[in-house]
Amino acid sequence: MGQQNIKILQSFNAPAETIFSILTDHESFGQVINAKIKRVVDSQGENKNGLGSVRRISAFPGVAFEETVTTFEPNQLMEYVISKGSPIKNHRGRMEFYDEQGQTRLTYTIDFEPKLPFLLLGSIIKKALEKSIGDGLRRLAERYDI
C-alpha cells in the first residue's frame, strides 16, 4: 500500500488559455476523460471553477467522490485534492500549463495512496487513471492538430 505517482505530459497546438479553459472547467474536463463530472460548489472568485470550487466525479455506478480546487492560477496552474469519498487518500492533482509560442505543454501529476490494504489496488487505480486521462488528453490534442 504505497504512494502512487502519475505523470502525464501532453502537448497541444493551441494556446495555454484555450487548453486551460477546457481542462479546468469541471464539466468539460469530464467530457475529455469520459467521466461524469459535475460542479457542486462554485468558487467565490471570478471563475466558477476556480479556487474553492468542488466537483463530484461519478467514476463507476455507486462510486462517487468530490475534489476541491486548492490552487487556481489562470492559464498556468490548477491543483486539487479529494475532499470527500473515494477509495484513495492523500490525493493531490496538479495541472501545469506552459505556453510556448502559441502552443501548450501540459504536465499533469497525480499522487495518491489507496485506502484499502488490498494487494495491487494502488497499481490498478494508477493504470486506470493513466489510461482514462492519457487517452482523453491525446484525443483533445488531436482536435488541434494542423
Name what the model sees in each region.
Residues M1-Q44:
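Hydrophobic ligand-binding cavity/cleft-lining segments
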Residues I8-Q10, E66-T71, H91-D99:
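Hydrophobic/aromatic beta-strand elements that line small-molecule binding cavities or substrate pockets
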Residues S83-G134, I146:
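Beta-strand/loop substructures that line and gate deep hydrophobic ligand-binding cavities in soluble
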Residues Q31, V40-S86, D135-I146:
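Glycine-rich portal/gate segments that line the openings of hydrophobic small-molecule binding cavities
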Residues S11, P15, P61, S83-G85, ...:
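Structured loop/turn residues at secondary-structure junctions
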